[in-house]
Amino acid sequence: LGDVYKRQSLQITNGFANPFLSSFKGVPEYADTFGVNHANALISLSQVSETLCILLIPFVLKHFGIKRVMLIAMLAWVLRFGLFGLGNPGPGVWMFVLSMIVYGVAFDFFNISGSLFVNNETDLSIRSSAQGLFVIMTNGIGATVGTLGAQAVVNRFVDMNSSAPQMEGWSMTWFVFAGYALSLIHI
């Protein structure tokens, strides 16, 4: 069940990063910044980071073990959400960039390492079933519950129908997500 809740972190960031960055268009001081005008390019840094971080997995698993790698992943989610909450597309754009880089660690160290762990720790006779269960729990149930829960938080703090800037609401939303990810470390 812990995997279901941990997978929610991934759904939170993937579902709301672009609307969050785009919401800065309503703030005059940020409307013409790189972070607003190139939100998709900024978000694509996450994919680059993910591609590079996957290469680190054999090294970190060998040197730190699966428990520490999973802990690093959860702390990376906390950092990613916290940086989103503190950053802005102006002078704080570096926090967004760092958040995109941290995403690779958060995603790969949890999902890929978890899948490798299941592969290495299960008997060959049940390995495919175990992998299937892992995928259902993370990408199926976890993704669904995560998306619904994250939307409830966004709906609570951000008025998506308002033309007024929603920066405070978005910041609070990201801090709630960071707190949630931090609480999962104890599961």
Task: Give the location of each predicted region.
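Intracellular juxtamembrane helix-capping segments at the cytosolic ends
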Residues: 109-122
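Helix-to-loop junctions at the C-terminal end of transmembrane segments
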Residues: 53-66, 154
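Loop-to-transmembrane helix entry
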Residues: 27-47, 95, 172
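Loop-to-transmembrane helix entry/capping segments in MFS-fold secondary transporters
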Residues: 36, 124-135
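A membrane-interface helix-boundary motif in multi-pass transporters
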Residues: 152-180
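Short, small-residue-biased leader/transition segments that mark boundaries at the very start
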Residues: 1-5, 187
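Helix-loop boundary and gating motifs at the non-cytosolic
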Residues: 10-26
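C-terminal ends and interior cores of transmembrane alpha-helices
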Residues: 76-89
